[in-house]
A protein has these predicted regions:
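Active-site-proximal alpha-helix that buttresses catalytic centers in soluble enzyme cores
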Residues: 1-125
Length: 125
């Protein structure tokens, strides 16, 4: 029964901003994940200008017992962070914690459901 012992963590990764209010939508996504699954282990992390960073967020989940961590990049487009920085950071996490199963979701902007939702919002009159 290995599955019962497995603790899965989710890191919602966003760009980051010095403006504290900028984080509110990211934190709202985390709150929604928890509403849908109160047992979820979800944290927010930021590429720059805000804390925690990805390494610190992963370290916190691992300290809490996570054996698998899924990183969900909350980016609309495949910019430099998603294309270059994130793969390097994920590689560093895998090297720092080889016992943890890290996975990377595709950027949310590539998810058909989000594209459809944004189109519906844009088309509202």
């Amino acid at each position: 029964m290995t599955m019962a012992a497995e603790m899965r963590g989710i890191v919602l990764l966003a760009h980051g901003s010095r403006d504290e209010r900028w984080r509110e939508p990211i934190e709202a996504v985390a709150a929604r994940v928890l509403k849908d699954d109160p047992a979820a282990h979800v944290v927010c992390a930021y590429m720059e200008l805000a804390t925690p960073d990805l390494h610190s967020a992963a370290a916190g989940l691992i300290a809490d017992g996570a054996t698998a961590i899924r990183v969900v990049p909350l980016f609309l487009g495949m910019g430099k962070h998603a294309r270059e920085d994130l793969p390097l950071q994920l590689d560093a996490l895998c090297k720092a914690w080889p016992q943890v199963d890290f996975s990377l979701a595709r950027i949310v902007g590539e998810e058909p459901e989000l594209v459809e939702l944004l189109a519906r919002i844009a088309a509202k009159s």
